[in-house]
């Protein structure tokens, strides 16, 4: 497939300041530098947060009123646009078109599914969300323990339903992009993919612009930056970890940045605990200013795909800590802890001990900071360019 002059469409429901939104924007900028025309289609464009990356090579079109990802109205509109703009490749980040797949395939356009989660993340997310809900009501809790868990989890039926879903997605696409080589291997093994299907699964690491002169002299500041959502992010763990560590770190403080559905609960829990030197700061449109001041970043998620917050922290010389909850997290921080601190899932006591060690030991922290500055070079946009060139050549 000839790359220069190629027309590519990317369909995604909301374009704003989310991690994936930023990746999609930066990818458009990269494509434009390769001579590719990019056509974005979305339901909601948050114009103040998300700017068109390269107006000479990029366009943005809102889907018609009433359109959803995916329904018949959206599919009909996208098919019309594919023909009108002579689009050759349709990239679908995360939202599988389900029953409309055959219609999209009938257009003759190459279909690329771009996954931004670890394998079977939906399964793990729904289990965590369900656990949170049932805690609120005794009868639901008992039902969960004695009925739903044995039937769905012990028999594996629920997990198998998600495995079947993944097989359908991979089979229906020309290529399936995943976040790192380890995920490609995990999908092939967990789904028992035949060779012709396994060959469709291609790793594509998300990259970012390298910070030319990161600030290395930092404040005694620990931060959390991210979406406030219970099922995956578990920001309450940040508070519990600080409850264990704050007495040993009297000259350090914690700031929590973010917004989301769990915001009020996080605020209430923070007030309930009454801990010193920890505060909720809300949403920030300038995370780079936070990273400029911070020494340590905490990630306390139950599951993660390729958390951009970790590589953003490394890019600014902030030492990240995270539970070793996925291959993506382990790849970013390094199995040898050379570019961050991995914690056994989900030990709060170990997390607190390692946090105290990191904050107290200046030499140790400086060594990890240098490891972060070396590791971040693996995320340079040049590597992404090479990967995309190979992807287009395969289509």
What are the residue ranges of the model-derived segments?
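Aromatic "clamp/platform" in nucleotide-sugar-dependent glycosyltransferases that forms part
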Residues: 283, 302
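Short hydrophobic beta-strand element within catalytic cores of glycosyltransferases
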Residues: 319-323
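Conserved acidic donor-binding segment of nucleotide-sugar-dependent glycosyltransferases
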Residues: 334-348, 356-362
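Short His-centered aromatic/hydrophobic patch
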Residues: 92-98, 115
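Conserved donor-binding/catalytic core segment of Leloir-type glycosyltransferases
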Residues: 214-233, 239-242
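Membrane-proximal helix-turn-helix segments that form the acceptor-binding/catalytic region
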Residues: 135-176
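N-terminal strand-loop element at the rim of the active site
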Residues: 13-17, 30-69, 183, 260-262
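Active-site proximal beta-strand in glycosyltransferases
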Residues: 105-148
């Amino acid at each position: 497939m000839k790359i220069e002059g190629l027309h590519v469409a990317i369909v995604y429901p909301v374009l704003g300041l989310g991690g994936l939104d930023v990746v999609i924007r930066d990818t458009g900028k990269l494509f434009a530098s390769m001579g590719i025309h990019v056509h974005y289609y979305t339901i909601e464009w948050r114009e103040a947060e998300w700017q068109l990356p390269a107006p000479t090579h990029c366009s943005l079109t809102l889907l018609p009123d009433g359109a959803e990802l995916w329904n018949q109205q959206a599919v009909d509109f996208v098919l019309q646009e594919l023909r009108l703009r002579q689009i050759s490749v349709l990239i679908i980040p995360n939202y599988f078109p389900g029953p409309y797949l055959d219609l999209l395939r009938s257009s003759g356009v190459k279909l690329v599914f771009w996954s931004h989660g670890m394998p079977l993340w939906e399964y793990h997310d729904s289990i965590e969300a369900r656990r949170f809900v049932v805690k609120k009501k005794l009868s639901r809790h008992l039902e969960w323990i004695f009925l739903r868990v044995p039937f769905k989890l012990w028999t594996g039926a629920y997990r198998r339903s998600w495995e079947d879903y993944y097989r359908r997605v991979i089979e229906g696409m020309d290529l399936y992009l995943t976040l790192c080589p380890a995920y490609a291997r995990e999908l092939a093994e967990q789904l028992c993919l035949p060779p012709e299907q396994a060959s469709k699964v291609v790793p594509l690491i998300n990259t970012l612009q390298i910070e030319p002169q990161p600030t290395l002299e930092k404040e005694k500041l620990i931060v959390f930056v991210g979406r406030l959502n219970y099922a995956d992010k578990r920001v309450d763990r940040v508070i519990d970890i600080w409850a264990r560590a704050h007495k040993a770190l009297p000259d350090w403080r914690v700031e929590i940045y973010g917004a989301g559905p769990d915001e009020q609960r996080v605020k209430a829990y923070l007030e309930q605990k009454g801990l010193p030197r920890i505060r909720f700061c809300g949403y920030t449109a300038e995370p780079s200013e936070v990273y400029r001041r911070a020494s340590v970043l905490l990630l306390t998620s139950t599951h993660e795909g390729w958390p951009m917050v970790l590589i953003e922290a490394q890019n600014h010389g902030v030492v990240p800590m995270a539970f070793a909850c996925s291959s993506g997290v382990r790849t970013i921080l390094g199995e040898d802890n050379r570019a961050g601190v991995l914690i056994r899932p989900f030990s709060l006591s170990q997390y607190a001990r390692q946090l105290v060690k990191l904050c107290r030991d200046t030499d140790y922290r400086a060594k990890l900071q240098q490891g972060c500055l070396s590791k971040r070079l693996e995320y340079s946009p040049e590597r992404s360019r090479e990967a995309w060139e190979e992807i287009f050549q395969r289509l």
